[in-house]
Amino acid sequence: MLSVPRDLWVNVTGIGEQRINTAYFLAEIEEPGTGAQNAKDTIEQNFGVKMDYYILIQFEGLTTVVDAIGGVDVNIPSPMSGYDTGVIHMDGTQALAFVRDRSGSDDFFRMARGQIFITSLWKQLLQPNQWGKLPAFVGSLSAVLQTDVPVWLYPRLGFALLRTGPDGIDSRVISRDEVIPFTTSGGAQVLGPNWEAIDQIVEELFGVTPE
């Protein structure tokens, strides 16, 4: 799992040089319904990793999903802005604030929080005493999820996630060490990619060598 900073300055498919987080919404403005595919194309074009499918959930949908299973116990491994080390039970509103908050930190910390939350949610759902909540989880998720994953593939993906478990996933973040902050000619403060360093991460994670 690789988290990419939203201000990374890349060549956005069909648009040109822009922040990577514009790949979705600028395409949606131009032609509704094309945003997800354009985001996939942009990732493939810049990182050299084939994107088979996408899963999109709006931040607000996270609240619905978390509340549907009665909250999530989030394990915070080290002190963060506003949070001490340990397990904190979060409802939907608290979980949304946790993954979105950048106060006292920045986008790099936000990405780390996102991975911490996903791992905590995953571990919780794998506990036998939580299996009774899976129907509510799946139902709430399907209501707020947008994806091109075919339905027939759902069981296979589910078994793969169950077999692998969150501890079997290598999670990385494109950090300050892989970017160079700069200001564009238009005055935007963005992050220039150090492709040599990023390509090394991509090769280690996905086993591909970007061209």
Regions from the PLM with identified roles:
Residues 1-211:
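Non-catalytic, solvent-exposed segments at the cell envelope interface
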